[in-house]
Amino acid sequence: MVRVCRVVPKDWSKFQPVGNVIPRTRFIVFKTPINSQLSTKIHKEQRFTTNDLFRQLSERGQYLGLVVDLSDTDRYYDKKDITGMCVQYEKVNCPGRGFIERDDCVESFHQVIQDYTDKCDDPDALIGVHCTNGINRCGYLICRFLIDRLGWSSHEAIDAFEQARGYSIEKGAYVMALHKAAKDKRDKQVDSDSDSSERQRKKKNKRKHREIVEHENIVLINTIIGELGSQAASVSGTDYQNSPNGVSVDPGQPQPHHWGFAIKRSKYAQLNQPVANGANTPPEPSEGTPQEEEEFEEDFEEIEEETETEPGKGQSVSSKRRARRNRMQKYMQVMQRGRFHEIQAIREEVALSHGSARD
């Protein structure tokens, strides 16, 4: 059984029951309807029930989509009188004392309005809000929504509410709290703008630093490629038609062999020279140190690898030079494209080839 109030709220009768729609919003404010039992205690012309509410709105060509009850009791009328008319009903209990200190009431009201506007596709369906008299608590919460969610100033919100309702907010503490809420929002927005400027500055510095690092990497890679080109030119001799280091070679002129090849060939000739005492007489031991003899043997083995090429096994010197030339051309093409990941892969390939050669 629904509990009912036995006393008409104080000063309830002196306020007009329904105000006008707040401009640029869907809010309409009214005082709380009362049940038929309470209506018998006042004059007929002062009565205001849920039936009177819907009748007055219908005469204006208006209709409700949501009713938000801000009173701290449910004894004035039965909410089924609202939901029975296919109108959504929401309750946000707001006490008469200490109300402006209750941030949870503000957040609950904001959430109820936001949820309804997000789901409702009918822009003409009004949002009815009432407390006991439809003045103080209604005025504070509606103005807070206009300030916090719609970006209105406190003066704009208060003026719009008071003109639509026909009455001023009576409690000065509520008005001061609205001005303070608007000031806090402005200060917060200034701090947010300064934080945004700081983020933009850091982003710009980060982008500038990245460009500097990329430029340094390109210079370093160009230097490495230049050194590799110089080394390849010194090793390959005149077989390069277009040297990476810019040295032009005339293919018509005979070019001398590399100095290392000349030394190895002379040592190989000395090793194969017949001995004066006879073919079977072993050569006289060299007067060099054991380290020099070991180096001589290694050079001899290298000359054998360069001068003797068995069919189907290994590569000739000219084949190696051609392969080396192709690799250098590939390196230059990669550098011209300027793609960092390809350049990095070339660097790793060169490092691995040098490491394997040493091993």
Curated annotation (Swiss-Prot):
Record's keyword annotation contains Hydrolase: yes
Recorded catalytic activity of this chain's protein: O-phospho-L-tyrosyl-[protein] + H2O = L-tyrosyl-[protein] + phosphate
Polar residues biased stretches: 234-246
Cross-referenced Gene3D superfamilies: Protein tyrosine phosphatase superfamily
Keyword presence, Hydrolase: yes
Pfam families in the cross-refs: DSPc
Tyrosine-protein phosphatase domain sequence ranges: 16-191
Coiled coil regions, renumbered to chain: none
MF annotations from Gene Ontology: polynucleotide 5'-phosphatase activity; protein tyrosine phosphatase activity
Superkingdom classification of source: Eukaryota
PROSITE patterns cross-referenced by the UniProt entry: TYR_PHOSPHATASE_1, TYR_PHOSPHATASE_2, TYR_PHOSPHATASE_DUAL
Biased composition (Basic and acidic residues): 184-199
InterPro entries found in the cross-reference section: Dual-sp_phosphatase_cat-dom, mRNA_Capping_Enz/RNA_Phosphat, Prot-tyrosine_phosphatase-like, Tyr_Pase_AS, Tyr_Pase_dom, TYR_PHOSPHATASE_DUAL_dom
Active-site residue numbers: C131 (phosphocysteine intermediate)
Biased composition (Acidic residues): 290-309
EC number(s) given by UniProt: 3.1.3.48
Keyword annotations from UniProtKB, A to Z: Hydrolase, Protein phosphatase
Family: Belongs to the protein-tyrosine phosphatase family. Non-receptor class CDC14 subfamily.
Name of the protein in its database record: Probable tyrosine-protein phosphatase pir-2
